[in-house]
Amino acid sequence: MTPRPPANLLHRVLLLLAALCGTLSAQINVELQFPRSTYLVDEPALATLRITNMAGRDIVLGEKTQNGPWCQIQVQAVHGSSPTPRQNSPSFPPLFIRAGETVSRSVNVLDIYDIPSPGQYRVRANIVMESVRDPYVTAPAYFTTDPGKVIWSTTVGVPEEKSAGDSPRTYSVITLKRREGVFLYAKLEARQDGWRFPPYQLGRMLSAMPPQSQTDRENNLYVFHAAEDDLYTLTQIDVATGRSGQAVYRSKTPKGGRPRMERLPDGRLAISGGIRITDEEMKPPAAADRAKLSDRPQGF
């Protein structure tokens, strides 16, 4: 008859195996989060991937493992057909994480998946390590894509001197309701050629003042909207290159009424009744120095 090991020895072996398994399963902690829940269709959906090294030693997440890239993003539609992965999506470079360190990386889900349709989507990140058999899987994170509401649209040509082809361009100005409020967007696309720029987020808008949208003499787009009670944003988008810029205005006088965008007799656009705010004026005031607890009040 084969002798049995002492009960206390068997107990120690089981504890050691459990400790080893626990060490392997707790090497890293991963989280995936979206800063907001709703995005316009085609708007970059940026998620934050946080990885905490709990292995007690420095680790390197390699660019590629036997089971594929070290970071694998999975996107599924909550209802309907799931989106298709892009063929040439960007790769994740190797990541060095010190013991006990937490690192964050931004992941644009639209760089990895083609998501042209509105809907709700479930996203997970799988982190693969050569030393661990099963990948680390994040809890699901959710986001919704919404087509928004088109409030203005026009199709224009591209001036010859800009040499951007003969295909006309279509501008669209869109509102999107989010939990944080109503936000204004613009789109620029060449529908005949089948391409479009990612949507431009123009900022939060006040519904009390409808946005003004016009094109200038070179067919560049200008959108003027109220962002706050006496804060107005002017956005310009170049018809050929898609480059954009913004300027901020306020009323000339407290009782002077709201500024407006107007077309001058020569066709140029101008802001009437508004003063442009400089970058210096937009900076928040410096916080006053707080008294130390050791400072004695005056007179003591």
Residue ranges and their predicted role:
Residues 27-32, 38-40, 44-110, 120-127, ...:
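Contiguous segments within soluble domain cores/interaction surfaces
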Residues 2-14:
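Bacterial N-terminal signal peptides that target proteins for export
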Residues 184-204, 233-251, 278-299:
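Surface-exposed loop/turn elements that mediate protein-protein interactions on large endomembrane-trafficking
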Residues 137-168:
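Low-complexity, Pro/Ser/Thr- and charge-rich linker/hinge segments at domain boundaries
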Residues 163-187, 212-228, 259-279:
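Short beta-strand elements that form the blades of beta-propeller/WD-repeat-like
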Residues 204-213, 250-264:
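Repeated scaffold domains used in trafficking and secretory/extracellular systems
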Residues 113-147:
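Terminal connector regions
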Residues 11-23:
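Bacterial N-terminal signal peptides
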